[in-house]
Regions:
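Fe(II)/2-oxoglutarate oxygenase catalytic core
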Residues: 1-144, 152-180
Length: 180
C-alpha cells in the first residue's frame, strides 16, 4: 500500500473481467455522459448480478481495514455499496477532470472509500493519477485499487490513445443511506 492507496494485483480473474465486459456490451442500461469531464459510457449495476465480485471486494476491503484499523472504530457502520458502475472509455477518452469520490448530494456525502478495478490491460497510458500522492496506476486486467473518498485523494484518468479501456468503479459508504 502506498499513501493509503491499496493495490491488489489480479484480484479479479480474467474470466470475471471478460464476463463484466460482455455484460456491459450487451446491456441496455448504458449511458453516455459527457458532463464534468467524464467522457465514456457507464452502466450502473447491482451486486446480485455479480456475487463473486462482491466477495472479492469484501475480502480486499478487509485487507485494507487490517492495515488501517481505525476504520473499525468509526462512529457509524459502513460497507461496500450495492451499486457500482462498469465504464468504457474509447481511445482518446477518459475522466480527465480531477475529482474526488465524496460529494455534496446525500448519496455521495456518505462515501468513505472509492474502489476501481481494471477489466483489461492497456499498453499505452490509460491509467489513473492521484496527484497529491504522486501516484500513478497502470491499467492491468484484474488489478483492484482502494483509496479514501475525500479531497486528499482527488484523482483523474489519463486517456489511452489507441485502446479501449474498461473499468469497474464503486464506493464504500456509511450504512443507512439509500445507496447502501
Amino acid at each position: 500500500m502506498d499513501k493509503y492507496i491499496f493495490k491488489k494485483d489480479s484480484a479479479l480473474t480474467a474470466d470475471l473481467c471478460k464476463l463484466c465486459i460482455e455484460y456491459f456490451e450487451s446491456s441496455d442500461r448504458k449511458e453516455d455522459d459527457k458532463s464534468r469531464g467524464y467522457k465514456g459510457i457507464a452502466a450502473s449495476l447491482e451486486f446480485d448480478t455479480f456475487t463473486d465480485l462482491l466477495m472479492i471486494l469484501n475480502l480486499n476491503m478487509q485487507s485494507y481495514v487490517d492495515q488501517h484499523s481505525y476504520l473499525t472504530r468509526l462512529y457509524a457502520p459502513w460497507r461496500v455499496d450495492n451499486v457500482f458502475n462498469i465504464q468504457k472509455y474509447e481511445p482518446g477518452y477518459a475522466y480527465v477532470e480531477e475529482h474526488m469520490e465524496h460529494g455534496k448530494d446525500r448519496r455521495d456525502s456518505t462515501r468513505l472509500l472509492g474502489w476501481m478495478a481494471y477489466l483489461n490491460t492497456i499498453n499505452n497510458k490509460g491509467g489513473t493519477i492521484w496527484p497529491q500522492q504522486n501516484f500513478n496506476s497502470s491499467p492491468k486486467e484484474g488489478d483492484l485499487y482502494i483509496w479514501p473518498a475525500g479531497w486528499t485523494h482527488s484523482h483523474y484518468g489519463i486517456a489511452a490513445p489507441e485502446e479501449t479501456k474498461y473499468i469497474l468503479t464503486g464506493w464504500c459508504s456509511f450504512v443507512g443511506v439509500d445507496n447502501t
